[in-house]
Amino acid sequence: MDKHLLVKRTLGCVCAATLMGAALATHHDSLNTVKAEEKTVQTGKTDQQVGAKLVQEIREGKRGPLYAGYFRTWHDRASTGIDGKQQHPENTMAEVPKEVDILFVFHDHTASDSPFWSELKDSYVHKLHQQGTALVQTIGVNELNGRTGLSKDYPDTPEGNKALAAAIVKAFVTDRGVDGLDIDIEHEFTNKRTPEEDARALNVFKEIAQLIGKNGSDKSKLLIMDTTLSVENNPIFKGIAEDLDYLLRQYYGSQGGEAEVDTINSDWNQYQNYIDASQFMIGFSFFEESASKGNLWFDVNEYDPNNPEKGKDIEGTRAKKYAEWQPSTGGLKAGIFSYAIDRDGVAHVPSTYKNRTSTNLQRHEVDNISHTDYTVSRKLKTLMTEDKRYDVIDQKDIPDPALREQIIQQVGQYKGDLERYNKTLVLTGDKIQNLKGLEKLSKLQKLELRQLSNVKEITPELLPESMKKDAELVMVGMTGLEKLNLSGLNRQTLDGIDVNSITHLTSFDISHNSLDLSEKSEDRKLLMTLMEQVSNHQKITVKNTAFENQKPKGYYPQTYDTKEGHYDVDNAEHDILTDFVFGTVTKRNTFIGDEEAFAIYKEGAVDGRQYVSKDYTYEAFRKDYKGYKVHLTASNLGETVTSKVTATTDETYLVDVSDGEKVVHHMKLNIGSGAIMMENLAKGAKVIGTSGDFEQAKKIFDGEKSDRFFTWGQTNWIAFDLGEINLAKEWRLFNAETNTEIKTDSSLNVAKGRLQILKDTTIDLEKMDIKNRKEYLSNDENWTDVAQMDDAKAIFNSKLSNVLSRYWRFCVDGGASSYYPQYTELQILGQRLSNDVANTLKD
């Protein structure tokens, strides 16, 4: 989607000839420049009580799907600018219809001493309250973070932030007589907020939440956030979500996909981890006069010269799509909102104007300000209220009144909530007698039935469809349960079912599931307890104790027994996966190694009845190891990826088996008598001299092939110290093309080189000054060749004749081409020895 979410921009009033040709388009951040009004106003007690009742009804969902709108104060006829002049006489907040549940006071271009403010608190609040509309003041987040307004007058300390929060609530809520506070948080395209500013804003937000909102001391006020930001980009939201009444997400313009709601769907997957669907509102924008490119959303119908009323039609609009959209999980959304509701009914400028700019504005007649009757808002509210998904859950849905009450409390009150709820439902108490209606919660993830002593029957028909997938079932204290039928629910265990409490059980059916009822499994014990409970009331029969036809699901084992394997030296090829890493386990961790073992497992029986389905096959049960990989490290640290080894000589391998993503098994494999595992003696070696770059030279001893050493010439040498005398048996050079970070051509490989040790083993290099040491190390006369390299292969490997040395040098004598050669790592392989042992071996 190639557009910026420049949402909720406000357009300055277009005043007479001076501003006629230009759009004063400002970001929603214009809120941040508005100072709170200092004058205190007493709101009548009646209005306070009415407002409190409205807030309670809204918060409890008694108003149905909500419709809210942002009214731009400078478009109210009472508003005047700093010059004292009226700006737009066409509209007034007083005419906002009852279909608007929440009206946001979105102020800008309105002077602090404008008559608008007295009209708001003395007239508009009362009038709108009487029709059932709550009013909420909107401010920008910069009012909280120290950038603008009151926040500039308070220090960023716990005490300062607490005082600032109180001042904000007083100035913007109490003194204006409104019903809550809305804080706008958007992306900053210039002068971006810092993490420190966001941290302060969050601290102040939390202090505000102590004062107002659902968790505040004054619960008669709403606390709302509106934003353009997704969850991952909004740390303030994540920190305050639990205190919000509503989250209003601005989705102005297309959101992708055929239905233009792809982004909304994606965002909701994250939002539902923090808020309920009943707190989530999505918003569109009416067309703002003189809007230019970047602020043209096309959320309402475009101007049609043949249909003057086109702007009042909602058919085919994005606004209607938003009204109809619902989350697929969690529940029904709270509702929708509109920005610039004072432009309701005005058609959008045609798409042919989509590239117009504020500096060269191509005007259209829809840019003119006109009176609105809020037709679109009325239609959208009606559309939502007539949506059958918002019908209240009744006795037809859930006959048992006690069950219905608990479901409404936890899931929501609307029919559409039932099929979307995807969390945990906990049912408790002896008032519930009938579970009919539970099946409607098709996406329920966990069901807890606790102390339902008057529920006598549980059957698959009464349980959610999700029980056939992976939903969890908990049953505790079901003392009155007589019939338990969990047949065909794909249950893999009976975990969560307190079978000891089902003391009145007369029959059960757990057949046609995926249970492991083998002798040592936990589910076998639970089965025997169930049978005992039935036997306390009647004789056990096939009809009253069904458990047959199980098809346990197979899993890869979490661990494998073999920690050290062995092959004889027989010159034969062996497969490590086949011999040491194999088998399948049930959910209860019963291990079945092969088809023969599975056949034996199938013969298992309880009370003479075979519990595994006769048509269940080993192929359907077993796990396939085809995607598994085996990484072998030989005694000389040579590495290969293969599950097959040929036992031709004594050798030892360290074996790592991975499932393609992670290592699942580690073992040691000996062939014949095995071999001593060597070490890379050069890993972490100290570079003591080089003809090249000293810092770069350290890279060849860091154990990583993601970096490389540049020789910067056809010849080069590096001298290094192993720290002590060691026994070296092999050496290995990883050439340029082994680089794991940057694809490197083999033409950059080293082709010729020499590995050397210091002749004089008694010399103390530490006592030399830097100049003398470099001269000494660079002199070929002081070194003895112990190996030569004459091949430009990717990994050059060669044996050494049990070389004893502490100080080594590697000389590059030529590359594979005219390019300067490179290499990534140098290894000296062998065993570490104490100085005493090394000296003894040398003698």
Curated annotation (Swiss-Prot):
Repeat (LRR) residue spans along the chain: 333-356, 418-441, 442-465, 478-501, 502-525
Top class in the EC scheme: hydrolase
Catalytic site positions: 186
Binding-site positions, Ca(2+): 699, 702, 704, 707, 824-825
GO terms for biological process, alphabetical: carbohydrate metabolic process; symbiont-mediated evasion of host immune response
TM ranges: none
Residues binding a glycoprotein: 72, 74, 88, 107-109, 184, 250, 252, 288-289, 295, 339
Consequence of substituting residue 710 to A: Does not affect endoglucosidase activity
Region (carbohydrate-binding module (CBM)): 678-832
Family: Belongs to the glycosyl hydrolase 18 family.
UniProt protein name: Endo-beta-N-acetylglucosaminidase EndoS2
Species this protein is from: Streptococcus pyogenes serotype M49
